[in-house]
Amino acid sequence: GEQDAAVLYTTAQSSNVCIAFLQRDAENRWKVCQSIEGLADTVDNVRLAQLQDGGSMQMVVGYLASQGDSYLAVYSYENGQVSAILEQSYEQYLVEDITGGGNQDLILMSTLEDGGVQIELLTVDRDGSFQQVAVMGLSADKFSGCASVAAGLGADGKRYLVLDGWTGISGNNLATVLLRFDEESQQMIPADQISTSELYSASLRNVPNLVSRDLDGDGTVEIPTQPDEAGLLNMSQSRRMDFIVWMDYTSPTPEKSFGLLDEETNCYIELPAEWEGNLLLTDSTEIDAAVELRTVDENELVLTLRLVSASASAAGWTRLGVVASRQMQAKLGEGAVITDQTYRLSRSLYRLN
């Protein structure tokens, strides 16, 4: 029931960061119980996690070496004794109850020598023992590294892991892998709802920072896609925008959100789903630095978007929010038809930072 403390510090005698673990003595003074040397000269992140039974917490420390390599260490601290239960290089990691066992699990991503991605799971097995399992690898012919990892609940109530990997000739494109924890094999396996190859093709996208995320805060991680049929683009090259469809492939109706991505401000503007497939995005000829959405079949103006100074008046416009220190405003066209009663233009802006 007593709180302990951990202090990260450097000394002239060590090139790496050190960690001291402290407890209060009988006179309520802090006393160093044990000190250990870390794995590099810089600490990138620190967090506590409950990875084991018994109520004790583990400390997860991400280190960044001067040459740019990242290392992860997991320290177990009980009764004044510290032990390192994991020390290895990594690219991305996630602490989440992905197995559904009640404790948090550690999912670790690292790049193999051949360029593929290895996924490791640190969890408590059925016998209560702490184990590290190499759950699967992503082949080097498809992926060259890990961009991001997220976890969430699927539409079926199961826990899923969503991995975005670098791919393409340049290595700057993204594609997604969807995994779930299998109770019988105690391993992460590909999701049943869509094949790995189908998901790779569907999720292939050319925006490096467009990663999977829980877009609407419902606990499910949505996967962004750039389908050609979502809409047409006819605008200047100075403004990078594209139509995006966010998908939940664990659901029998996978499409969650349709809208417009503004790469310049890294924001997403949700649009009525009924507009998908019948939109043309073009520069406005009437309003400076604005863009218009028009119907493909009738060239009807349905929405105008513009970026103005944060203090500009929004009279006659709907203020969506402030992005990149500027105000995003929108105005529906006179011929715009929205049958979806749940859609609200004023709540359509999502910041993707």
Feature roles, as predicted:
Residues 1-284, 349-352:
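Beta-propeller-forming repeat regions
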Residues 231, 312-339:
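Extracytosolic low-complexity repeat regions of secreted or lipid-anchored proteins
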Residues 274-320:
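Secretory pathway targeting signatures of secreted, lumenal, and periplasmic proteins
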Residues 269, 291, 328:
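A broad, low-specificity signal marking well-ordered, structured residues that form hydrophobic/aromatic
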Residues 90, 166, 228, 294-299, ...:
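Secondary-structure transition/turn motif
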Residues 279, 330-353:
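Surface-exposed amphipathic alpha-helical segments
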